[in-house]
Regions:
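Multi-pass alpha-helical transporter architecture, strongest
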Residues: 38-41, 121-133, 305, 334-366
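Hydrophobic core of transmembrane alpha-helices in multi-pass small-molecule transporters
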Residues: 31-34, 44-64, 170-171, 258-274
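Short amphipathic helix-loop junctions that connect adjacent transmembrane helices
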Residues: 181-203
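A membrane-interface helix-boundary motif in multi-pass transporters
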Residues: 104-120, 317-343
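Central cavity-lining transmembrane alpha-helices of secondary-active solute carriers
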Residues: 1-12, 205-220
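Cytoplasmic helix-loop-helix junction between adjacent transmembrane helices
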Residues: 52-90
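C-terminal ends and interior cores of transmembrane alpha-helices
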Residues: 29-43, 239-254
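Juxtamembrane intracellular "pre-TM" segments in multi-pass secondary transporters
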Residues: 132-167, 189-194
Length: 366
C-alpha cells in the first residue's frame, strides 16, 4: 500500500515545493520515530500502526534517493551510468552488514532489530541534510490542469517507449514480489525433512549470497549499459529471473541440488540490479527535469506498488493450488510456473520495446 501511494505523491512534493534531500531527511526521521515506537509498544494494533507509518515514510525515500544521487552526480559533472553504480553498491553492502549483525547478535528474535533500524534511520535522516541541494525544478510556463493536480509525471505514458518500459517494470515487479514473499518460506520448508542439511543450518549465509551477488552485478552495470543499452540489459534481467526461479525448481537442501540453490542466489543479483538500478537510470534519462522526482516515484509505484500487489495475489493463487492444509506440497511446480511467467514476459518485452542503442566506446580507448 505504501509503495502504491507514497513514492509518486512525495515525488510531486519534491518536484514542486521541497528540496528532495530535505524531504528525504524528514521522512527518515519519521521512520526512526515510528520504529522506536514499534520496538516498545505491547499492543499489536499499535504495533501495526507504527509499522504502517514507517513504511509510508520509508518507501518514498527509495525513489528520492535516486533523484538526490543523480542530482549530485550531475552537479559534479560526472556520468550517471558510469558513476552511480559504485555509489549504489554501498546500499547493498549496508544491507548485508545489517543482516549479519541482526543474525549474529540475536536481534532477529527480539526488538533489537527495530531499535537498530531506528538508530540507522535517525542517522540517515541527519546525513541527508549534508547532501548537495536538490531543489524543485522551475515551474513550467504553461501550467495546465495536470500540473495543478500534480499529475505531470503521467506524461511519461504518452511516450510509447517509456509506457512499454513502465508496463514491463510492473510485470517484473510482480516477479520480484514472488521471490520476496516465497523465497524464505521455500528454504524454510527443508527444515522439516532435512534439519541437518547444509542449506538449512547455514540458511542465512545462503540467502546473503544474493546480496553479495548484487554488489558484483551493480558494479557491472556501467559496462553493460554503455555497451549494450537498456533493452539488452533488461532482456538479460528477464533471463536471470527465469534462471532464478528455474534453479529453485530443481534445487534441494543437500547433495548436488544444493548447487542450484547457490546458483539461484548468485543469479538473483543480475535479475534484480539489471532491472531495478538500470531501470531507474533509464527513467532518469527519459523524464524531463521538471518531473525528475515524480518520474522515479512512478517507476517505484509500478514496481514495488502495483507489481507487488498483483505479484502477491497471483503467486498466492499458484501457491494455494499446490498446497494442502496450508502446506505447500509441490514447490518445483510452483517455481516452474514462475519461471515460465518470467520467460513469457521477457519474450514480449523483446518484441514490443523499441530502442536503438549507440555504444559508448571512448572510455575504452584511453
Amino acid at each position: 500500500i505504501a509503495s502504491l501511494i507514497m513514492p509518486a505523491l512525495i515525488g510531486v512534493v519534491s518536484d514542486k515545493w521541497v528540496n528532495a534531500e530535505r524531504l528525504m531527511g524528514v521522512l527518515h526521521w519519521v521512520g526512526a520515530i515510528s520504529l522506536f515506537c514499534a520496538a516498545f509498544v505491547t499492543d499489536y494494533d499499535l504495533f501495526k500502526i507504527a509499522m504502517l507509518v514507517n513504511m509510508l515514510a520509508y518507501m518514498p525515500t527509495l525513489s528520492l534517493s535516486y533523484t538526490v544521487a543523480y542530482n549530485a552526480i550531475d552537479k559534479a559533472g560526472l556520468d550517471r551510468i558510469k558513476d552511480y553504480p559504485p555509489v549504489r553498491v554501498w546500499g547493498t553492502i549496508g544491507f548485508i552488514v545489517a543482516m549479519w549483525i541482526d543474525n549474529l547478535t540475536g536481534f532477529s528474535s527480539n526488538n533489537g532489530q527495530l531499535i537498530m533500524a531506528a538508530c540507522a534511520s535517525a542517522a540517515m535522516g541527519l546525513y541527508c541534510f549534508t547532501l548537495p541541494a536538490c531543489p524543485p525544478a522551475k515551474a513550467m510556463k504553461n501550467n495546465g490542469l495536470m500540473s495543478v493536480l500534480g499529475l505531470d509525471a503521467l506524461v511519461l505514458f504518452k511516450n510509447y517507449r517509456t509506457a512499454v518500459f513502465l508496463l514491463f517494470s510492473f510485470l517484473l515487479g510482480a516477479a520480484l514480489q514472488v521471490t520476496n514473499m516465497y523465497g524464505v518460506p521455500f528454504l524454510d520448508s527443508f527444515k522439516a525433512t532435512h534439519p541437518e542439511a547444509w542449506a538449512v543450518k547455514y540458511s542465512v549465509i545462503l540467502s546473503s549470497l544474493s546480496q553479495v551477488s548484487e554488489t558484483l552485478f551493480i558494479l557491472a552495470i556501467p559496462f553493460f549499459m554503455s555497451r549494450y543499452g537498456i533493452k539488452r540489459v533488461m532482456i538479460i534481467s528477464f533471463m536471470a529471473w527465469v534462471l532464478r526461479f528455474g534453479f529453485f525448481a530443481i534445487g534441494g537442501p543437500e547433495g548436488f541440488p544444493v548447487v542450484f540453490l547457490v546458483l539461484s542466489m548468485i543469479v538473483y543479483g543480475m535479475a534484480f540490479d539489471f532491472f531495478n538500478v538500470s531501470g531507474s537510470l533509464f527513467i532518469s534519462d527519459e523524464a524531463p527535469a521538471s518531473i525528475k522526482a515524480s518520474a522515479q516515484g512512478i517507476f517505484m509505484m509500478m514496481t514495488n506498488g502495483l507489481g507487488s500487489i498483483v505479484g502477491g495475489y497471483g503467486a498466492g493463487l499458484v501457491i494455494a493450488y499446490h498446497s494442502e492444509n496450508g502446506v505447500v506440497t509441490d514447490w518445483p511446480a510452483c517455481w516452474t510456473i514462475f519461471a515460465a511467467y518470467a520467460c513469457v514476459i521477457g519474450i514480449l518485452f523483446a518484441l514490443t520495446f523499441h530502442y536503438k542503442h549507440q555504444a559508448k566506446v571512448k572510455a575504452e580507448k584511453v
